[in-house]
């Protein structure tokens, strides 16, 4: 770590810490007013945002990014309007700050009141998707937290203009003591430049990395600060021979094809050996644009498929490839899922309640779906307005991380002279 990199990180984190203290005094109305202005600025600056995004897209073409990665990077009119809608939904959510979690009077007369309070300073590291900066900054601001945002180099120009809109809205608000440092954007995209931030456990309260396996490992191995992991999504689906026929293909196509470059897109499909339409199903998936890879048992039923290797079943493709394996039972499917899963999203298509219960109770992931698309594993779809990400860990939060998960608690104890005996 160079002296310059260390001082750069310390300067940003120190300002964010100071800014977080001022945020605590804001009312819900004041916070929502700033978010409303950001919402308006997004729509007013659509042309400028798309222009900056085009620079990132052109750079992506030169770098040879996959079509799925380019889709993650794209900002068009529809997505900008969706970002504005997301802010509106966050504004309309109840403010968790100040919520009473517990109130009681102890036998000795002490009054205990536990309330939700902001975590403080949240650093989020993310890749590719520039809309993430709007979701995280909005959620952080509404929950009273300062945020430090570090996006990937591929979305640099998009991230820069989006963060500047927050700075403009905050500057126009004239709120006392609230500065643009409540939303800090790290312009240095070199991975090694992140390390100095990871040592500032006296200034940054939590780090939330969302991205590939390499990023998660890098942050976890180098950070002194608590890390909430938003790991890769190796999403698995078990297709039972007892599934309702008319829902199978629409769910599989939606789960895989709608947006293949996101973490809740399907990656592995396990089909019961007695499912009656395996050949037709795989053919229909190919017609829908899915690149089907099959293990040897699948190849014996549907010849000429490319081989799905053992490594493929551990892989978050983030494109149209799909690994397929034929299994003997729900237990066989579960054993495979337990082996390959990243703990993100699992799904079963079946009409057998006993089989469904076995599947639900036997797996351990952030979300388990029954007879619906895996694409619903999303903060917005879960009614959270938006999400910081989808946590694959088990501590503090698991699954979509929304407003309430950006808070902790403080207990206020009031007495009348009591001393402990």
Swiss-Prot record:
Where is it localised?
A: Cytoplasm
Spell out the molecular function terms from Gene Ontology.
glutamate-5-semialdehyde dehydrogenase activity; NADP binding
What class does this enzyme belong to in the EC scheme? oxidoreductase
> Domain of life here?
Bacteria
One GO CC annotation: cytoplasm
Per UniProt, which keywords does this protein have? Amino-acid biosynthesis, Cytoplasm, NADP, Oxidoreductase, Proline biosynthesis
Report if keyword NADP is assigned.
yes
Q: In which pathway does it act?
A: Amino-acid biosynthesis; L-proline biosynthesis; L-glutamate 5-semialdehyde from L-glutamate: step 2/2
**GO biological process terms held by the UniProt record:** L-proline biosynthetic process
> Which family is annotated?
Belongs to the gamma-glutamyl phosphate reductase family.
What is the name attached to this protein's record? Answer: Gamma-glutamyl phosphate reductase
What taxonomic classification does the UniProt entry list for its organism?
Bacteria, Pseudomonadati, Spirochaetota, Spirochaetia, Leptospirales
Q: Which gene encodes it?
A: proA
């Amino acid at each position: 770590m160079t002296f310059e990199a260390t001082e750069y990180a310390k300067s940003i984190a120190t300002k964010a810490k100071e800014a977080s203290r001022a945020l605590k005094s804001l009312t819900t109305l004041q916070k929502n007013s700033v978010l409303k202005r950001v919402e308006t600025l997004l729509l007013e600056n659509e042309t400028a945002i798309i222009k900056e995004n085009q620079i990132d897209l052109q750079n992506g073409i030169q770098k040879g990014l996959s079509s799925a990665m380019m889709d993650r990077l794209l900002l068009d009119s529809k997505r900008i309007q969706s970002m504005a809608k997301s802010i509106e939904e966050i504004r309309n959510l109840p403010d968790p700050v100040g919520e009473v979690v517990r109130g009681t009077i102890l036998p000795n007369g002490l009054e205990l009141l536990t309330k939700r309070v902001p975590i403080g300073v949240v650093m989020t590291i993310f890749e590719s998707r520039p809309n993430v900066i709007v979701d995280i900054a909005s959620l952080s601001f509404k929950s009273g937290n300062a945020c430090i945002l570090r996006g990937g180099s591929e979305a640099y120009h998009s991230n820069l203009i989006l963060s500047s809109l927050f700075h403009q809205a905050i500057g126009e608000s004239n709120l006392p003591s609230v500065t643009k440092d409540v939303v800090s954007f790290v312009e240095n995209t070199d991975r090694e430049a992140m390390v100095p931030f990871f040592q500032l456990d006296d200034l940054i309260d939590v780090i939330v990395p969302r991205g590939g396996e390499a990023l998660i490992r890098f942050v976890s191995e180098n950070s002194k600060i608590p890390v909430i992991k938003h790991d890769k999504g190796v999403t698995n689906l078990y297709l039972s021979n007892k599934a309702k026929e008319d829902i199978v293909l629409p769910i599989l196509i939606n789960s895989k094809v709608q947006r293949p470059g996101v973490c809740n897109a399907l990656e592995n499909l396990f089909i019961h050996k007695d499912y009656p339409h395996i050949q037709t199903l795989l053919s229909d998936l190919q017609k829908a644009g899915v690149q089907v890879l099959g293990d040897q048992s699948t190849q014996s039923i549907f010849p000429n498929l490319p081989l799905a290797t053992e490594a493929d079943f551990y892989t978050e493709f983030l494109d149209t490839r799909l690994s397929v394996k034929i299994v003997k039972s729900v237990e066989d499917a579960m054993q495979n899922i337990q082996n390959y899963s990243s703990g993100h999203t699992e799904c079963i298509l079946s009409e057998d309640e006993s089989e469904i219960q076995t599947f639900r109770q036997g797996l351990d992931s952030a979300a388990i779906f029954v007879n619906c698309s895996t694409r619903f594993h999303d903060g917005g779809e879960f009614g959270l307005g938006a999400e910081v990400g989808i946590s694959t860990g088990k501590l503090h939060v698991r699954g979509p991380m929304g407003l309430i998960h950006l808070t902790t608690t403080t207990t206020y104890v009031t007495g009348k002279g009591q001393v402990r005996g």
